[in-house]
Amino acid sequence: MFMQSSKVYRFTICLAAALILLSGSSLSIAAAAKPSSSSPAVSSYDVVVIGSEIQGVLLAKEAVKAGLKVLMLDPRSKLGGELIQGQMFFLDDVNDNKQRSLVQGEIKNLFNGYKAGTIRKAADFQTYFDKVIQGIPLKSGVVLDHVDIKTAGSGKTLSSLTYHGKEGNKVTIQSRYWVENTDYNALSSQLKEARIPGMETIYNGKNPDYMAATYMLNFKNVDWNLLHQRILEDYPLTNVRKKYGPNTYVDWHFATGFSNITNTYTTKDKQLRLRGLNATYQKNGQVIINGLLIYDVNPSDPKSVASAVQRGQAEAPFILSFLRKNIPGFAKAELNGFPEYLYIRDYNRYETKYVLDYPDLMNSRMFWDNVSIGGYSIDLQGTRAIPTGIGYGKPDRYGLPLRSFELKSYDNVLVTGKNVGASIKAYGSARIMPTTALAAQTIGIILGRERNKPLANLTEADFKRIRAYLKQDYQIVLQ
């Protein structure tokens, strides 16, 4: 009997062990089938802005002020784009045909400081930019890996975006609205929207063409008083322009023109051209000039950008020597450092719900959904095919509708800055920074204050109300 009990005992022990093993195995299988609790949840936002150009920063700032959940992702490693990294410190004013300024909104603070002389040097612009971008959650140096697009009927929604940062970990996020705010279509180029024809249409070219980029030139030891004096000695202004070229003008702060002189300069590098000068006096003998054009730059290709920057730096000493001999006040000038980036004035633009056209500008058309007012001359800068560029007149004030900043096929993708939906002639005016900056800020305000209604559903009656609070609360007038 003892032996039988012993067998039963051993059988019981073995059965229990087997059950434990089976139980453990089934637990392991269940654990494998169940998602790991450590898997990161997908973060959701109200607004995600791609890129840190000043326009999108202003949009994001207003959204943050309104309490929306915002994230800025910059594919560039350094912030500020054209304004900060490209050092585009010659600011173009925008006026109507009665010479009334059309610069409004937050960007007016930058222009006021610029005109007053308190914002002229790189450190001044950096201080302004830092103040505006403060409080906006951001990550720089990211790579956009994948976009998830949902289709509903004839429309599309950008559902989610996956990116990775310097550490390499992939992150997927969702957002109610996405904003293209780079100068090379980092986001919109992935969304399969039709490209708006560009500079090639001016001369019936077959391949896409773009206005030249600019490499800004910094100088020191410039005698600005002498430059001013010499130009005054050649007055009246008609004589100045006959001698130095159209649009030549010098005051205590700014200088433009001198194309009769610069046209005699031949660049060492045939990809470059020295056009007429737009110069800002930064005080203490320091001057920055917008005048060196670089053709065929692809801002989406880091190698193309790096090559253009190197070409600009290599040409600068020869330009310095030329200016010393030919422009009053530059006899003892020296180079004063180099920007790390370019002023990209034109790249691909994709169709929006309304594409602004040349007749809209020249007929001073106002739209029911205006988000900005433009008025800059229609200025198409040079390409290899049209080296000197071409102008198409000066419009009076005209409107830019919200629909020109909404990607055509999408209900939740916005564009800012030089991504504005405009035909190439209209773009020659609409591209100017204070015009697109006002549009971006206005859109940011609307996103916050109209958060309970999709932008696509806003009506003419809504915009009548919107215009009222923009005027009262922000001193922004859009008619």
What is each of the regions a protein language model found here?
Residues N169, Y177, Y184-A186, K192-V477:
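Flavin (FAD/FMN)-binding glycine-rich loop and adjacent Rossmann-like elements that form
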Residues C14-G24:
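Bacterial N-terminal signal peptides
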Residues G56:
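N-terminal Rossmann-fold NAD(P) dinucleotide-binding loop
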Residues G24-S36:
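Sec-dependent signal peptide cleavage junction
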Residues A41-E53:
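Beta1/beta-strand and adjacent pyrophosphate-binding region of the FAD-binding site
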Residues S43-Y45, E167-Y177:
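Core beta-strand elements of the Rossmann-like FAD/NAD(P) dinucleotide-binding domain
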Residues E62, L68-K69, D74-K150, K156:
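Conserved N-terminal/central alpha/beta ligand/cofactor-binding core
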Residues D148-T172:
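Conserved beta-strand-loop-beta-strand element in the redox core of flavoprotein oxidoreductases
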